[in-house]
Structures are given as structure tokens and as C-alpha cells.
A protein has these predicted regions:
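Catalytic metal-binding/acid-base residues of hydrolase active sites
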Residues: 134, 164-165, 195, 214, ...
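Mid-to-C-terminal alpha-helical segments outside catalytic/metal-binding sites
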Residues: 5-58, 86-94, 115-119, 206, ...
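Active-site gating loops and adjacent loop-to-helix segments of metal-dependent hydrolytic enzymes
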Residues: 5-39, 166-185, 224-246
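Histidine-centered divalent metal-coordination motifs
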Residues: 7, 162, 212
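Aromatic-lined glycan-binding groove of carbohydrate-active enzymes
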Residues: 196-198, 202-244
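Active-site gating/metal-coordination segments in enzymes
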Residues: 57-191
Length: 318
């Protein structure tokens, strides 16, 4: 949450968003819902201190998902993306040996998203783009977004996908189910559309990193395959099996269970898994390496891939 964007929003209430202070603590207010703005989201020194505590050498910095701002009018969305991207670039410039930047894009206007992506790659050297699992309910596999995905592919960037809302509303009331169930569900819906739509066949070099261990994707891939074999409707746009397409995705290691992470590694290979933290939020890891060490039968090669190798490859630093 770059300070420049925070200053721009402070006290404003246009489009239902602004930043406010309560007892000296800054909050982001989005149409009446308050979210604390942790110091690590905007203060480089605090970010580095947290990384040191977690034994993280290099971190890719991305915006907090509630601030994708896909619901804003196109011009306002572009302005918000520019503020975020330039703010992240300034953070990275403070400590370029330890921080990398991820772009955020105004996906409500695909043409503007392409222009902004080309700008941040040229001006800031970003190698990654953070996107929501959907854009106000429209899937990333929708044809209207294909040119954005193609530009990401052509520029050699990868996509980091993180939900910002739960598109499936029924049964999600209470117990924070919109997060615990809804976020992984949104991830599997997003991945399924990319697979079955033929988008991944068309975009052969597109790399997509999914948060939270891929949601339910790696654990239900057999069901995807079964449908593709036995139901013609699943083969309308692609003849490529979902299991083959699974290897086109990358995943963070944030599964909250060592046996789940072991299964993920066995399904896709350690070279497609990278450390994830969800920092500084309460659903993340405070000791990601310690969590990794709990994985049964983890080999030194697998550990090296997950700790370093996969991230280096995605960022073009291998």
C-alpha cells in the first residue's frame, strides 16, 4: 500500500474509498469496510525487518488484493494502478538487492492495462503482474482479456494470481468462509477456465503462479481429467488433458499443512512450487522455512527449488 497512494486517498471518499486514522492506526475504508494498513505494506525498513525475522532474502512486492480497484471507472482505475506501480518501484529502488516489484493493472479497461504494463516493464523493469482470480466476476480466460494475457506472455512476465473476493456467494455467510473456502474455490474456478477454454493452448509460454497452493486445483486434477475424457462438453475448446495443463501452472507453498504440500510437490514437481508468505496478513506464515521443513521426505533438491530456484526462474534470474 504505497504511501503515495495513501496520501492521495487520505480523507477522500470518491467511489466509496478513502484512508482514515483510528487511534493513530491507518485504515483503508472501502465502502464502509475497514482494513488496517500494516506498516509493512508501505515502510521499507519495516518490510525488511519482517523479512529478516522470516529468513527471507528476497521478496516480490505486490499490492494488497482489496486495492486492485477493478470496480472503479476506467480512468480512476488507471490512475490507481499508476500510483501503486510507481510507489512499489520507489520501494524497490530503496533496496533493489532484496525487493522485486509486481505490477497491478486496470483490468476493467484491457487496452489501458496493456499500456500500463508496457510502461512499468520499460520504466521499472518489473517481471511479474499480480491479478485477481476474476475481474468483477469475469474470468481471466474471457476473450476480452486475452490480449492482456498475450502481452504479459510476450513481455516475458509471469502472473501471480490472488483472489480479492469470493465470486461464489451461496453458503459463504459467516465463519470467514468467504476466505477459507471462497478464496481456494475462486482459484480452482480461474484455473479450470484457463484450462478448458483453450487459453493455455493458445498462450504456450504464459506462466501463472497461483496463491495458497493452488486452492483445490492440484487435489482434484483427477476429476478434471475424468471429465475431459468422458464428457464432450469438457473438450469443446481443448484436446489437451487437464493433467498435462497442470504443469503450466506454478504454485506457492502456502498450504497450511505439510502433507498437502507434499502432494502438491508430487503432482507438479518442486520446480513449480515457490515459497509464499501472505505477509503481513494473519492467514500467512511467520516462519515459511520452518513450515517447509515439516514436509515429509523433502529432498535437498526439492528444498532448493522451493526456497530459491522456482522464484529465480520465474523472475528471469536463474
Amino acid at each position: 500500500f504505497p504511501t503515495q497512494r495513501s496520501s492521495h486517498l487520505k480523507g477522500r471518499s470518491g467511489n466509496g474509498i478513502k484512508t482514515v486514522e483510528r487511534d493513530g492506526v491507518p485504515y483503508f475504508e472501502n465502502n464502509g469496510r475497514l482494513s488496517a494498513i500494516d506498516i509493512e505494506l508501505y515502510d521499507v525498513d519495516a518490510k525488511l525487518e519482517a523479512m529478516d525475522r522470516m529468513r527471507v532474502d528476497v521478496s516480490a512486492v505486490s499490492v494488497a488484493p482489496p486495492t486492485y480497484f477493478y470496480y472503479l471507472p476506467p480512468e480512476a482505475g488507471l490512475h490507481a494502478s499508476k500510483l501503486s506501480n510507481d510507489g512499489i518501484a520507489r520501494m524497490v529502488a530503496r533496496k533493489p538487492d532484496r525487493l522485486r516489484g509486481m505490477a497491478t493493472l486496470p483490468m476493467q479497461d484491457p487496452d489501458a492495462a496493456i499500456v500500463e504494463l508496457e510502461r512499468v516493464v520499460k520504466e521499472h523493469g518489473f517481471k511479474a503482474v499480480e491479478l485477481g482470480t476474476s475481474v468483477e466476476g469475469e474470468q481471466l480466460a474471457h476473450p476480452k482479456f486475452r490480449k492482456v494475457l498475450r502481452t504479459i506472455e510476450q513481455l516475458g512476465c509471469f502472473i501471480f494470481v490472488h483472489p480479492y473476493t469470493c465470486t461464489a456467494k451461496g453458503g459463504m455467510e459467516g465463519y470467514d468462509l468467504f476466505n477459507t473456502i471462497g478464496f481456494p474455490l475462486d482459484e480452482v474456478i480461474m484455473a479450470a477456465h484457463l484450462m478448458f477454454s483453450g487459453a493455455l493452448d493458445e498462450l504456450q509460454r504464459l506462466r501463472v503462479l497461483i496463491a495458497h497452493g493452488g486452492g483445490y486445483v492440484p487435489y482434484q486434477i483427477g476429476r478434471f481429467d475424468c471429465a475431459h475424457r468422458n464428457r464432450a462438453s469438457a473438450r469443446v475448446n481443448t484436446q489437451t488433458s487437464p493433467r498435462e495443463l497442470l504443469r503450466r501452472f506454478y504454485f506457492d507453498a502456502l498450504t497450511h499443512d505439510p502433507h498437502s504440500l507434499r502432494l502438491l510437490i508430487d503432482q507438479v514437481g518442486a520446480d513449480h512450487v515457490a515459497i509464499g508468505t501472505d505477509n503481513p496478513f494473519d492467514m500467512g506464515y511467520q516462519d515459511p522455512l520452518g513450515e517447509l521443513e515439516k514436509v515429509p521426505d523433502l529432498t535437498p533438491h526439492e528444498r532448493e527449488c522451493i526456497c530459491c530456484g522456482t522464484a529465480r526462474a520465474l523472475l528471469g534470474e536463474a
